[in-house]
Amino acid sequence: YLMESLGMAVIALEIGALSSARAMITAKKEYISEARAILDIGATRSTLIIFDHDHIQFSSSLAYSGEMLTAAISQKLHISYDEAEMKKKTYGLKYQKSKNWAILTKLTDKLVEQIQKTLDFYYSHFQNSNKITHITMCGGGSALKNLDKILSLKLKISSKPGNAWKNLNSPKPIDFDEKKSLRFAKAIGLALRAADNPFFNNDTI
C-alpha cells in the first residue's frame, strides 16, 4: 500500500542475509566439503549467516552490536557516548586484565558463546552439513581492533573482515577504504543483484 501510494512498484524483496552473502562469499570459488559463515556486526544487532552447499542454510540474530559496546564503555568510565565511541575505535578490544575493559571482554565472550551455540545447532540439526572453515566478517563493527583475533582464538576457526567489493567485475580499481566498505555490505550485495539481473530485462527474480 505504501509503495502504491507513492506511485512506485515493488521489483523485488530480499532478506538482508542474502544481500550480505552475495557480497561477502567469493562468487568464483567452489566450496567443496566446506562451509562458510558470515558475521555481520551492525550498530544495533549482529547476524550469523551459514552458507553451505552453495546456499544460505539459515541465519541467527546475536545480542552484540557496536552501540552495545559503546554504551558499556560510556557507563563503565562515566564518559559521554561520543567519547566512548572514540575510545572504542581507537583501542578496540584490549583482551587483557583491565578493570575498565572487563565489560567488553564479558560481552565479547558472550558473543563467542552465541556463535558456538549457533554452529553446534547447525551441525546437529542439518543433514550433510559441512564443517565451517572460515568466518567472514562484515558490518561496521567488524573493523573493531582485535575482534577477529579473539574469535579465531576462541572458536578455533579462522575469522577475518572480508572484502565487500571482491565480486564486482570492474575494469577500474575501487577507490574506497576497504574497512569502511564493510558497513555497506548489504547495499553492495543489492547492487550486485541489480547488475546480474538488469531491470530492463524484466527479470524480477
Which positions does each model-derived feature cover?
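Hydrophobic/aromatic-enriched cytosolic interaction surfaces used to assemble or bind macromolecules
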Residues: 1-205
